[in-house]
């Protein structure tokens, strides 16, 4: 049984349970035993020695949701001994997760898989930091999620600036290197933007129309949030902002590598 499809099926089940909760005449009651019924068709097709292993994968997924605070053992509002495990209840945070249409930021494994499929050339450093960011977001460690997201974004920008530097011809290349080499990322980006603006109009149409959105808009927004998180500003971070940044990151990375490919083309 494929883990990704199993997780998707479990999420769909919890979504269905949430919809039942909207009916005042019904009270969702979930037991761990729902897994056997949910995967009855898949399990029945397996040899006997594989059935327990398949159910174990499903149980692991449920416990992962418990670990991030989306579920808790027991029934809501009950405190009697018989009302705890194997009963499970969707938490308020879980309701937020399962009700969301874009599920990927709440699924670290699925998020990285989708990112790699969309941007197969993504480098290991960027992938490592964005993976940390998604994992931290799911634990509600918003400071860590914001900082690691910012590092991933910065690394992509450094990759682009390097490709652009190699694309430039002298004397522009030498002058640009003197202004940007070994500087803070804010300085490097400022010099890059100033220089790149002169070349943006010659980009292919599909790259030309969005460069300010992806480079000036998304990169700067992520960088400023990272600065707020990385310094003792006391500013409260928004989970919705981190979620939105994680949503757009794959498109941002795709644009960076498309632009890099253009700059490296003969």
Locate the predicted segments by residue.
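Short acidic, hydrophobic short linear motifs in intrinsically disordered regions
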Residues: 21-50
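Short, mixed-charge amphipathic alpha-helical segments
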Residues: 46-56, 117-121, 192-223
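Short, charged amphipathic alpha-helical segments flanked by flexible coils
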Residues: 41, 163-212
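Short alpha-helical segments that sit at the start of domains
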Residues: 1-32
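Charge-enriched, short contiguous segments at helix-coil
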Residues: 71-85, 205-266
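Short amphipathic alpha-helical interaction segments
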Residues: 50-68
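Short, hydrophobic, well-ordered secondary-structure elements
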Residues: 130-162
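Charged alpha-helical initiation segments
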Residues: 2, 83-143, 251, 262, ...
